[in-house]
């Protein structure tokens, strides 16, 4: 009887665990809210921040966790059974961004409700979805007349509908994102439909020079869009005997630790500053530097003074730049490339670090302004940075009037006549309409006709 009572007690507890509480019941999916521009559209499938959002098909049932695949199973825990068959649903998301610049924004004379539109844009050349931004500089209606209204519009679509999230922000004088607003869920777009914020930012705050949102009376709106591209099911079977949880790769962290704690170092690099910064000494590893840089490889391979003494002195690179360069050589990563791009591109060119050099070119392209465009072009020419050079010339051509009023342009005219010639040649090519060659008419065939 005692054993029977214990069995009944255990059975009743098991049944209690199998019952799903009211708080555990799934919520119903909310339908689309079409009533107002500022109301959110809820989505039946919740979206995350990753490029590909996966949703495993194994749900919690009767109080037990089911492992849908080897990646989430625990090999040593007998309480977590492993599903022999599983499915992953991958919601693929395409992310892209767009910047819209409006010059002389304070002169916009549009009345309340009137619209300015950007040119159309898409995620890529083969993307059939066309988007544009539109603003109401003086608000959409009476309620928002003191605000700037901002929307994302689906101009062209080859589907019945598209789900997308978006984020708007304004770039200040330092090209930093400010006043960002984003949708918390994916919106349902159809062709000709827009979603956005009726009260994006107050006009008086935007126009106040002290806030620095209109440098040179130029409004720069940055938009990031995430579009649901497709949903793919991936199915498979689990081989229980091969369940291994592989830890993430820590190679970059381990290599940084090797650089930082000087363990097993066999070479000393002394870096002196021309700007008064303290001299720094780096204890490094010849094998790593030789593998990463052809310059260091040649230095260590031949019987040079540096190779014999296992020490070298560098006085043409600042110590903090040299440290960032060495961190990149050990880990393949760099934290401060945006702040050090001009100095790092010189160091990367000196030590023939081609990938780092292109990374610096990209960072400098993002930092292009009318004030520094000429200097950036001269920098690109000095270090044979072809991509940065082409981008700088194109930027100067697009903003020629503003660039020609800067001191950097005067330096370019005075010291770099060949570069100046290249800029004018590109400008002339851009402005001259293409020449259409007209072929002479073909001769008529001769006929034996008296007329």
Curated annotation (Swiss-Prot):
UniProt GO molecular function: ubiquitin protein ligase binding
Keyword Nucleus applies: yes
Cellular component annotations (GO), alphabetically ordered: cytoplasm; nuclear speck; nucleus
GO biological process: proteasome-mediated ubiquitin-dependent protein catabolic process; protein ubiquitination; regulation of proteolysis
Superkingdom of origin: Eukaryota
Subcellular location: Nucleus; Nucleus speckle
BTB domain location: 265-338
Residue span, MATH domain: 95-225
SUPFAM superfamilies: POZ domain, TRAF domain-like
Compositional bias annotation for Low complexity: 60-75
Keyword Nucleus: yes
Family of this protein: Belongs to the Tdpoz family.
Stated role: Mediates ubiquitination and proteasomal degradation of target proteins, most likely in complex with cul-3. May promote the degradation of bromodomain-containing proteins such as bet-1.
Note on domains (UniProt): The BTB (POZ) domain mediates dimerization and interaction with a cullin.
Protein name: Speckle-type POZ protein homolog
Protein source organism: Caenorhabditis elegans
Species lineage: Eukaryota, Metazoa, Ecdysozoa, Nematoda, Chromadorea
Gene name, Swiss-Prot/TrEMBL: spop-1
